[in-house]
Amino acid sequence: MKKYMGIIVDAISRRQFKGEITVENGKIIRVEEKEHDNEQYILPGLVDAHVHIESSMTVPSVFARMAVAKGTVAVVSDPHEIANVMGEEGIEFMLEDSKKSPLKVYFGVPSCVPATPFESSGAVLDINAVDRLLAKDDLHYLSEMMNFPGVILEFPDVMAKLESARKHGKVIDGHAPGLRGADLQKYIGAGISTDHECFEYEEAREKIELGMKILIREGSSARNFETLYPLIDEYPDHVMLCTDDSHPDTLIYEGHIDKLIRRGQEKGLDIYNLIRTAVFNPVEHYGLNVGLLREGDPADFIIVDNLKSFNILSTFIDGECVYENGKVLFPLEKVPAKNVFNRNKISIDDVKLVPPAGAIQEQTTEKGIKKIRVIVANDGELVTGQELIVPKIENGNLVSDPERDILKMVVLSRYSDDPVRIGFIKNIGLEKGAIASSIAHDSHNIIAVGATDEDIVETVNRLIKNKGGIAVGTAENLLDLPLEVAGLMSTLEGEEVASRYHLLNEEARKLGTSLESPFMTLAFMSLLVIPELKLGDKGLFDVTKFEFVDLFADE
């Protein structure tokens, strides 16, 4: 039996009092008021309501060490990334590795593997696989249904997966950026209960009014807290907090859900509403076995210095102290490498793009060249735009134009030696060099963007040599971070991954980019379910039209 004194924050009765909690056999057996001189605060542990652990570039047991240091006791996680690479074997790896740490990880069953039929993935989870996985007790919900056109148009395979979730009594998560009106009503009517993709305030309000729970996302690239935070006080019972995709440097240097508690208070939000969104709502919505600082609950709680600075002093899970005084108190176990990578190196000829016959015509533009469709990246958002722009041509080859910030981008399958697909992108900002990654949502093929063809080829070939990872630099000077688990995650300690990743980000900035998170932004430029224009391993894709389009536009 152990006792802990402090100022207890009771979010249910919306009060704070000096008291003591008594813990025995992993449970809180008593919460009582008691006078003492301890000025530290005791609160329920925090919950990330939607996260892809793979985006931390660390395996679950390593991610857990970063999370508990920020007061997180549980996460609701979609193993969608590794499932696209390794299928059910990848999901099983995540389940087993998560057992090496005390962090409570609630995995779901990925609903869209692959995300679309328009790209190459390492696996397919059809209705039979999804139904089999949903029957498992350690898989707790149907993960984000990204194929919202399939829901609205009632594609049989999509509807069968939703029906399977209902049959097994599992919650269904949503993914519907920008969906409004009648289509939204149909989407919600299919039993989909959440959305973490809102980037406009009115969109989020409409979804809440129709019965959805909104997860306010603040990750490394997609950052929606600034736009959506008023919802926390307006609809405290209908909002949760999540990171979705957060890189290791963000987790270590900025924080996890704890940073949103701090920012919310800076915005003048009610502390009890913040705790509700960060703890109570996800626990209740997903039915998590996570304590809420009540008698009889699991002893999952945190101790902080004060509510304003919200510095995490200690984290407890099931009554065990897992973090205290800057130290994680559980061991780091060895993790075996696992991967699927079948790609040979490419040559300079593979990334050359010669305009097809008819693309150069005097009547099309003032330069006599047809305009091309260019992806327009938006810093901090997953949604892209598109512009029609006259390309730069050298020696008959379409090339990057750093002066106008129009850069060549390539995507190539990691699963075969299929042809390299080529597009162009604006707002990356590289003046020289290239960046490349085998983290490329959602099928995790190889994606690269650069100022010259030579730089692109060298960074891509470094990834192929490493069988996955990220790389940045020029043809003469490259830095890399190998990711030996599925080309998505490292087995190194979180601090080391964060440090190396930080160095790669700094190198990218030296090459000219001003993006907040260049590798995270790059990773979403091949995600064919988020508008507007993206590049996959089978070609340029217009998400709004849900079809492939030619690089050269007919004006």
Curated annotation (Swiss-Prot):
Enzyme nomenclature, EC number: 3.5.4.2
Disulphide-bridged cysteine pairs: none
GO molecular function terms noted in the UniProt entry: adenine deaminase activity
Record-linked InterPro entries: Adenine_deam, Adenine_deam_C, Amidohydro-rel, Metal-dep_hydrolase_composite, Metal_Hydrolase
UniProt GO BP: adenine catabolic process
Class in the EC hierarchy, top level: hydrolase
A Pfam family the protein falls into: Adenine_deam_C
Catalytic reaction equation(s): adenine + H2O + H(+) = hypoxanthine + NH4(+)
Signal peptide residue numbers: none
Keywords: Hydrolase, Manganese
Cofactor(s) recorded in Swiss-Prot or TrEMBL: Mn(2+)
Entry's family note: Belongs to the metallo-dependent hydrolases superfamily. Adenine deaminase family.
Name this polypeptide is given: Adenine deaminase
Annotated organism of origin: Methanosarcina mazei (strain ATCC BAA-159 / DSM 3647 / Goe1 / Go1 / JCM 11833 / OCM 88)
Organism phylogeny: Archaea, Methanobacteriati, Methanobacteriota, Stenosarchaea group, Methanomicrobia
